[in-house]
Amino acid sequence: MEQASVPSYVNIPPIAKTRSTSHLAPTPEHHRSVSYEDTTTASTSTDSVPEVRIRSESSQVSRESPPIRASKAFVASYEYEAQKDDELNLPLGAIITLVTVETNEDGWYRGELNGKVGLFPSNYAREVTYKDNLVEFKQDEIMLPVAVRTLSDCQIGHGATATVFKMDIKIKKELQNGRMGEAVGDQMKAALKRFNRHASNFRADVVSTDEQLEQLKREANLVNGLSHNNIVRLLGICLEDPYFGLLLELCEGSSLRNVCRNLNSDAAIPLGVLIDWATQVAEGMEYLTKQGYVHRDLKADNVLVKEEVCLCMDEEMFQYAYCLKCGKRPFDKLQLKITDFGVTRKMTADANRFSTAGTYAWLAPEAFKEGTWSEASDVWSYGVVLWELLTREEPYQGHIPATIAFQIANKGQNLSIGDSCPDRWKKLMQDCWNLEPNFRPKFSTLAISFKQYAKEFKDTHLQRAPSKMAVKELYSECFADKTKEEFEKRFHDLYAGSGDINRKNRHSIAPETKARRLKHHKPKKADITGPTEVKHILSVQKDDKNFRVKTYDQSSTGGTLPRLNERQSTLSLSSPDLFHISNLISGSNTVGHSAHRISRKNAIRHKKNQHRMFESPVVSPTMDDSNTFSTIDNADEVDPNHSKESKKGGTLSRAWAKLPWNKRDSKEDHDERAVAGSISSRSSSTTSSNRLITGQTTRGASAAGLLEIGARSRAQSTADGWEDPNTTKKHKVSPSDKRPVKTTNQTERYVKDLEKDTPLRPAQLPPTHRKSALDQTIPASPNSPDSINNFHPMPLSSRRTTANSSSDGAPCYDALVSHSYGAGHGHKNHFGLSDTIPLFPEEPTHYDMGPGRPFGTNGRAIVNQGGDYYGNISGQNYEGFGHGRSINQSTQYYPVGGGCDDYIPIVQKTVIKPTVGEVGNSPYSENIRCATRNVQNPQYIQCKKNQNPRRIPALPMKIQSESNLVTSGMVFTPRDEQLNGIGNSLSSLSLNEPPDIPAPLPPVVTYPIPASLISPSNRVSMSPPTRMAPVLPLGAMSSPRIMDKEILKNSSVEGTEIY
């Protein structure tokens, strides 16, 4: 071997344990198969080779120190294709010289093949000892028998692939000690199986002489070394013409099939003899299975008889070793040999014996359909051999063979031979024909069973005649014409689609290749080093992120937590800001720095730019006195059954309460409000269904009255809240109240998600939102026309309404109003929570309603059309505080929902002019404007349309006083947005039917107005309608856009200072 062929490294692991060779024996026709035990647990073929693990460099040694060679050889039992450069390609039957078993790869040996040294899987090769080395014979060492002149005269068998001759061979040293048979002098008898070159059993039809020689050697190595009394042994090979072939152990008694068929039909073979024959075949197959062989063509024709058979059938001769009449062996003394496995396999065999019908008779269904063989498939064939021995018939002769076997297997009976057949024999055959391969017995079990069977029937001599008669009856029953078509159909269903049998396409199950993993062996003392010095290694990294920590930075506009890299905060932000919070203890109304600050745990914390679920981005003011929370006398009742329901769903409720936003609402809001005495309009009014719609009406000329409504409503609600603390409250009045709130779909939480984009805000506003107290004065925008003179304040009933929701989803504040006479007239125009609200001396007692007029498609009233329409004020001469109108001017009432049954007037266009510089980018259309909408902080203008209006039911609003009648005329034009109320997509009420909601009588309220200004002409007498059917024309414009248009046209409106 050349030095260059040695790999650059050799791994030296501990000695690998001895590999079991029970699964390494060769398989016929270029392939091997594992034992039956392996096939039931593993089905990995050589086509899916596991990933090979690369060895570490620490296990490599220098090429200058080659390993010590071992004097052993291995024969490749399976074909293996190298997966790495340091591995060997293993052709089937190749002889591998073992280099060493000491590799660092578990299950891998190092060997030499064709001058190359490399690794090979140990379970793909079988060890060959010195005595099993293949013996080669020369041409002159093979001789014809004495009385034979030509080779054809000594022919004893012929097949499509090979011809068998009876020859004399010279005894060699390796064949001494009588291992192969009787020897006469220096010669012994042998069978020469010479292959036909034109139809050889190799992979190609035409191969070169060198290739034939090499393949013959490899395939001879597969069966070499097998030694068993029931296995035909290989004596050697001859590589020279005319004796090119294999030299096998000679069996002069022909095949077991011929023995059974040559007997007289009237002669019966004793059952004890049949049991002995079945035992020998089972023991021979058990040995092959342990050596890793799968026969794949087991039948009576491939079971040979060692000696010539006595056909005298004289039972008296059974007590002798040889027949006294013919000198041959009696039946009970025959030695059976299994042959025709390995390379001697015939591709087609004789035409009559290896036809399609003959093959199906012994072939297991799974082997034919799937093309894989195992011990279980040989067991199936063994059952057919038992049937041959008992019946001495060709199985399924004249018919498709596997049909009967399959049909009887489905019924639980396979080739039953009648009541006269021993039940034990019958059961053994049926077990071999189990359709499930895993349920078939093994050959070792069969051998033991027949040995026990032989002991039981040692003295029993059952004749064959009764059994033969039962078999004949079986044939006549099974092959009747009426059932033949059914049997053929069953056979077609079993074997159809598998194609013709082709042994070149057959393959056996190869063992799984072990992954090349490094062995972990126990370390030696020399490998253990002494103690080393202990070192503490610290990793220091330069800060390139400009990390800094802010500690109580009062110049910061954000929260109080440190920020990394000056990023936008994703943490929580204090609200109120701990750096900009008023002195709550001293009761200051101004926002600024104070020596007294609340603790951080009492502050409301909100995610910056990450609003909580159903949370409005605009929060109500949070600063007021400690008496902020109050009961609402006419709020919706809490469902008395809710407590029972919450008990049933307690697990879900508790889980929902543990969510982050719920925790903050229940704990942090409660702590902050309890200490600071603050309140949000959302938490104090969500229980009420009496709501006013919100919008931009707080910024126009008609907004003053509605702004006053909010202040009066808040004050009224607060005053109503003083009650006995021991009285059980039925409504939620503060965040600390743990009772459930009856929510509606029109709350600010619900409509928050409808605003996808941040609304536009007017100029000159603070960069960030600052919370304001309920009683704190919020200055108007420089361009705001909120200051209105000559507008009488409009009172509202004590029913609390939600002041922070709007029909278009716009967030808003509660009313912050001015006096009807303007700034500085009369009294403080925003009452405090503790102020006494004076009453007006007079109040209207009834309403007079008159016929109205419908609206056209352009929003203008239709004249000269008959019919009365509900919601129209009768034409009376009225002069109110504000702009005048004609005596016959009628006002269309438009329903606005929000939880109360109020209406607002819609009047025709007259004289309102906007202040110069008023909002110039207002997107609202022209022509008409609703008289009132709900309150909104005048610092903000909601300019974004609601892109996703929701269908929210609402009730109309009733008029409480004649001061509600705004005298400005307006014209109604289309707008894309929707208003809550009857006749729009947000209302569940119909336009065609008047609502059954009567307007309740207004409350008694005293107005603080000079008596000189009050006259009978300033009042309008109306009767409350019983049914009102307001009409919103198609394509009409919503009220906020109408009002904005009127504001822009009113040049006489001046700014208002709000206290």
UniProtKB/Swiss-Prot annotation:
Query: Which segment of the chain is annotated as a signal peptide?
Result: none
Question: SMART domains recorded for this chain?
Answer: S_TKc, SH3
Pfam families in alphabetical order: PK_Tyr_Ser-Thr, SH3_9
Catalysed transformations (reactions): L-seryl-[protein] + ATP = O-phospho-L-seryl-[protein] + ADP + H(+); L-threonyl-[protein] + ATP = O-phospho-L-threonyl-[protein] + ADP + H(+)
Record bears the keyword Flavoprotein: no
Protein kinase domain: residues covered: 150-454
Q: Where is the composition biased (Low complexity)?
A: 38-48, 678-689
Phosphotyrosine: modified positions: Y940
Q: Any transmembrane segments, and where?
A: none
Q: Where is the composition biased (Polar residues)?
A: 623-633, 690-699, 774-790, 798-808
Where in this chain does the entry annotate a coiled-coil region? 199-224
Disulphide bridges: none
Query: The motif NPQY motif: which residues?
Result: 937-940
SUPFAM superfamilies, sorted: Protein kinase-like (PK-like) (SSF56112), SH3-domain (SSF50044)
Q: Name one GO biological process term.
A: positive regulation of axon regeneration
Binding locations of ATP: I156, G157, H158, G159, A160, T161, A162, T163, V164, K193
Instruction: Please give the annotated consequence of changing S355A.
Output: Abolishes phosphorylation by max-2. Loss of kinase activity. No effect on the interaction with max-2. Loss of resistance to heavy metal ions such as Cu(2+). Impaired axon regeneration after injury
What does the record give as the active site? D297
Q: Which UniProt keywords are given for this protein, alphabetically ordered?
A: ATP-binding, Coiled coil, Kinase, Magnesium, Metal-binding, Nucleotide-binding, Phosphoprotein, Serine/threonine-protein kinase, SH3 domain, Stress response, Transferase, Ubl conjugation
Regulation of activity: what does the record state?
Activated by phosphorylation at Ser-355. May be activated by svh-2-mediated phosphorylation.
- UniProt cross-references to PROSITE patterns, sorted A to Z: PROTEIN_KINASE_DOM, PROTEIN_KINASE_ST, SH3
- Residues annotated as carrying Phosphoserine in the record are S355
**Its job:** Serine/threonine-protein kinase which, by phosphorylating and activating mek-1, plays an important role in the activation of the JNK pathway composed of mlk-1, mek-1 and kgb-1. Involved in the response to environmental stress such as heavy metals. By activating the JNK pathway downstream of tyrosine receptor svh-2, plays a role in axon regeneration after injury.
How does the annotation summarize its subunit structure? Interacts with max-2; the interaction is independent of max-2 and mlk-1 kinase activities. May interact (via NPQY motif when phosphorylated on tyrosine residue) with shc-1 (via PID domain); the interaction may facilitate mek-1 phosphorylation by bringing mlk-1 and mek-1 together. Interacts with svh-2 (via cytoplasmic domain). Interacts with tpa-1.
Per its record, how is this protein called by name? Mitogen-activated protein kinase kinase kinase mlk-1
Origin species, per record, is: Caenorhabditis elegans
